[in-house]
Curated annotation (Swiss-Prot):
InterPro entries in UniProt: A32L, P-loop_NTPase
Family named by the database record: Belongs to the orthopoxvirus OPG160 protein family.
Chain sites annotated for binding ATP: 25-32
Stored Gene3D superfamilies: P-loop containing nucleotide triphosphate hydrolases
Sections of the chain in a coiled coil: none
TM regions (residue ranges): none
Quaternary data: Interacts with protein OPG137.
Top-level taxon in the UniProt lineage: Viruses
Annotated protein name in UniProt: DNA packaging protein OPG160
Length: 270
């Protein structure tokens, strides 16, 4: 008998300790929009959020300060930017400690592809980032892009309508509570019964699951889906660009407006 239960994912649990999360699913599966839904929770603790991505993605406008976005089009640029970021994190932690405060950091890697598996600094972050108060989120289309040497330290595996074989391969290294066969059966059952293409199915490691045999589910927030800006998300993050907040928000609103008009035009013409 399968003893696993389906439960609503408690986002606040991500604030308890550093985590390493993988969001896996095909293009358009809802990975990014779900990640953005987590921001209102994450910014309560993580004041320094950095994005690494090969190309500009307008979805992040209004969520991450522009000077914290790193465009990494090659293996070398990813390694270089991560080394610089690590150095800045270490300096920031030293300053915070001198003032008897703590600083927490979040690194997000979106669609970086196979460059992830070859990045030594990323593997260091996955294995030892918790000692630098740093959490990691990887958005991948396939589990193959998750570095093999870092899979044993993944704390949250979020799947978006992926194949059971992909889930099985990912879970081989991840430390989980209970039998992996039961987890996969429950995962398959949820995907079959709850045919929501944007449903996030979250498997936690043996620490974050709080001793329970559970698989969590969650969905993106309505406000995020409707592209409603939440100013507090940027305000709660640290950046030297805060003085330019109004300009950044106006630019974001204009882009969203143009995007809506473009979508409306396409609908009319079709």
């Amino acid at each position: 008998m399968n003893c696993f239960q389906e439960k609503q994912f408690l986002r606040e649990n991500l604030l308890k300790m550093p985590f390493r999360m993988v969001l896996t699913g095909g293009s358009g599966s809802g990975k990014t929009i779900y990640l953005l839904s987590l921001f209102s929770t994450l910014v309560k603790k993580y004041k320094h959020i950095f994005l690494f991505t090969p190309v500009y993605n307008p979805d992040y406008d209004g969520y991450i300060w522009p000077n914290h976005i790193n465009f990494v089009s090659s293996q070398e640029s990813l390694e270089y930017n991560l080394i610089r970021t690590k150095s800045n994190i270490e300096k920031c932690i030293t300053v915070a400690q001198n003032h008897k405060k703590s600083a927490h950091f979040l690194l997000i890697f979106d669609d970086v592809g196979d460059k992830l598996s070859k990045c030594n600094t990323l593997i260091e972050f996955l294995n030892f980032g918790r000692h630098l108060n740093t959490s990691i989120i990887l958005l991948c289309q396939t589990y193959r892009h998750v570095p093999i040497l870092g899979r044993a330290n993944i704390t949250h595996f979020c799947s978006f309508n992926i194949s059971i074989s992909d889930a099985e391969n990912m879970l081989r290294s991840m430390p989980v509570k209970g039998k992996r066969k039961d987890i996969l059966n429950m995962l398959n059952m949820i995907q079959t019964v709850r045919s929501n293409n944007r449903l996030a199915i979250i498997i936690e490691d043996s620490v974050f699951c709080e001793g329970e045999l559970r698989i969590c589910t969650d969905t993106a927030d309505k406000d995020v889906i409707e592209q409603k800006l939440n100013i507090d998300i940027l305000v709660n993050q640290y950046s030297h660009m805060k003085k330019n907040l109004n300009t950044i928000l106006e630019s974001t609103k204009t882009k969203l407006c143009n995007s809506d008009q473009s979508s409306s035009s396409k609908n009319v013409s079709s």
